[in-house]
Amino acid sequence: MTDPRLTKWADTLASYCLDLQPNEQVLIRADEAAIPLARAAYRSALERGAHPHVQVIVDGLDELFLMHASDDQLDWVSPSRRLEYESIDALCAIIAPTNTASLAGVNPARQARAQKANSRMRQGLFERAGGGGAKWALTLYPTPGAAQNAGLSLALYEEFVLGAMFLDRDDPAQAWRDFSQAQQRYVDYLDGVELLRFVAKDTDISMRVGGRKWINSDGHRNFPSGEVFTGPHEDSVQGHVRYTFPTAHLGHEADDVHLWFEGGKVVRAEAARGQEFLEAMLDTDQGARTLGEVAIGNNYGVQRFTRNTLYDEKIGGTFHLALGNAYPETLAVNKSSLHWDMVCDMRPNAGGGAIYADGALIHENGQWVI
């Protein structure tokens, strides 16, 4: 990518997403292929008076660790990394997958074990962020592997990525502020709702959300963003949902996932492909069969499925439900080392769908009607 585009991206991360202030400690944690953006982000952080530190994740280390680590090593958490997560003011995570199938041959149970060991450290950062004590932003640098997954050339994928983040506009930060203001109207409405019901193809699922806090996800954490979300009451989810798109997690993919809920728990789960992995993730821990998040995608600049959740869950006209860990700022309490988002399309070309709030129609065939 050319320098001007990287500079605009990095400046938006520093000024809008993280709102870096003088003397704040910021960790820039980047995959190896994302070094150009990490370098630009480092400069932007310096220009704002922050204290940046860069960590580069070498390609292939995760696969080596999960294939060869002993059980003790899978359970071990680096004290230095834990201290870093406890002390930083901001985290900028830049994902750049060169091989999106690099973990496909890894035993899912080993992945779940390693993820569980590190979940407390991540949960601590989320709790600090929910209380205003820390900031984080996650973004995805385009690679040939990600472009191939999306069915696009690298050049077209780069344009897609830039458009999803509003980086093709003169003032991306102002565009996100305008978007945030428009999206806040939905948050204000949903904060007064007790019961939500989602109806779509092979889907009819209800949950209580009264007393929970809806979040306006407007690019300050996930970048790009464009969703409103909360955590449902843990024991309230009833019904079934059939997800439109294949869903990837930890390098594995499950296709045509259909889940049935009773009393807030998944009691039956089917996948046309990836059944073993789906069952392994559901058995990760006690909270893995409970929903930690319900969200509605509002970024109509994202129109196509790309096999990357960061973009797919934001598609305007979709909703997604996440199994496992809840975000503390929503006032939801489910805890799990798993957080797995799965997306259901409600647009007309997918068969349509509707969302009801306390019995009133609020969203139809991919569009808000309030």
Predicted regions and their residues:
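Short, glycine-/Ser/Thr-/acidic-enriched flexible segments
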Residues: 33-34, 97-99, 143, 203, ...
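Long, well-ordered mid-to-C-terminal structural blocks that present hydrophobic/aromatic surfaces
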Residues: 232-280
